[in-house]
């Protein structure tokens, strides 16, 4: 496999997972709002969440971050109840157990492959910030997650 082919394949497999239109999500009716969860509540996470909320087609219903203060700050800003705010390295897994249509991954890049794979495994659509991974094994994990998401009609 050439580097060019790898990059093209990885990019194509992830691209479909980043487009979240209500009419494409299984079970979502036309003009209905998409329930999303945010993984990573730092500055960029709150910024992208604000864009989703301002768009009007999304409800931010769950949050996860390693740090409690970040989750609480974002929860207060977006009106997410305390019982839908999760903390710790694996707090995002509790978020994935919630009734969500999609997740927005804005955590540090070295967590992206594992979090995206777990989100696809949980049947969620994924919007993942770049860089999607920091090494080749992470890129391969993302590529495989994209293939699984396509096979399961998640993108």
Identify the residue ranges that each predicted region occupies:
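Beta-strand-loop-alpha-helix segment that lines the small-molecule cofactor/substrate pocket
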Residues: 108-109, 113-155
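N-terminal secretory signal peptides and thylakoid transit peptides that target proteins
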Residues: 1-14
């Amino acid at each position: 496999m050439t580097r060019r082919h790898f990059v093209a394949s990885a990019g194509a497999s992830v691209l479909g997972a980043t487009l979240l239109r209500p009419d494409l999500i299984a079970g979502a009716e036309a003009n209905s709002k998409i329930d999303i969860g945010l993984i990573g509540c730092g500055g960029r996470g709150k910024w992208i969440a604000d864009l989703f909320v301002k768009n009007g087609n999304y409800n931010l219903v769950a949050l996860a971050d390693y740090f409690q203060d970040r989750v609480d700050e974002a929860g207060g800003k977006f009106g997410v109840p305390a019982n839908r705010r999760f903390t710790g390295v694996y707090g995002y897994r509790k978020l994935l157990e919630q009734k969500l249509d999609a997740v927005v991954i804005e955590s540090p890049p070295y967590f992206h492959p594992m979090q995206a794979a777990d989100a696809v495994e949980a049947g969620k659509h994924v919007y993942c910030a770049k860089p999607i991974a920091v090494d080749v094994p992470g890129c391969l994990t993302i590529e495989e997650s994209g293939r699984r998401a396509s096979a399961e009609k998640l993108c």
